[in-house]
Swiss-Prot record:
Protein species of origin: Gorilla gorilla gorilla (Western lowland gorilla)
Quaternary structure and interacting proteins, as annotated: Binds to caspase-9.
Keyword Zinc-finger among record annotations: yes
GO biological process, one term: apoptotic process
Chain's gene name: BIRC8
GO cellular component, one term: cytoplasm
Higher taxonomy: Eukaryota, Metazoa, Chordata, Craniata, Vertebrata
Record protein name field: Baculoviral IAP repeat-containing protein 8
Pfam families given in the database record: BIR (PF00653), UBA_BIRC2-3 (PF21290), zf-C3HC4_3 (PF13920)
BIR repeats: 7-70
Residues holding Zn(2+): 39, 42, 59, 66
Zn-finger region bounds: RING-type: 189-224
Subcellular location: Cytoplasm
Amino acid sequence: MTGYEAWLITFGTWMYSVNKEQLARAGFYAIGQEDKIQCFHCGGGLANWKPKEDPWEQHAKWYPGCKYLLEEKGHEYINNIHLTRSLEGALVQTTKKTPSLTKRISDTIFPNPMLQEAIRMGFDFKDIKKIMEEKIQTSGSNYKTLEVLVADLVSAQKDTTENESNQTSLQREISPEEPLRRLQEEKLCKICMDRHIAVVFIPCGHLVTCKQCAEAVDRCPMCNAVIDFKQRVFMS
């Protein structure tokens, strides 16, 4: 009997909203108390399931250090779950879009680390979201590199400045070289300013230190929030 089969048996006549086969595949078994379940590997427990909740996503959300989860889904999946959580608060919903289009765009944009990087470089969230939406609608896919995204954002800013001929105040002009220079600086650890950033702090979501410096801090150097978990990320 495989691990999956053994875990599945524990659910018996499971009558709750989440599919028991999906729960078993995600490494969970039922403990016989209402809808409470537990991971066979990390021991993490979950309960109070809501309809359409994904067991893998909940596993990654609450127990990102689980080795079984890491083996089955990989670093990128776990990183995307936590980056999505940290960015969802910045989403401005618009009633002009259909629900299906809004879902498609949010599913494509928010797991993308380039969004957070562009925000950290000083670009406005609404401008980034708008240009990513246009990219998806015209080409069917999102940006592949941060450099191309930055170049298009700078170009859009220049077009906006030229069209607003009646402005009464001068706008600071960003040269094409400046964002690229800042991009290189933004990739550096904000503590040692030597190695590349490689760790995202949970729950605040800030990505500001290399692996070595992250091991030496208990609070986020950006917002001073207590760090509950340190998740390794791999930037391209």
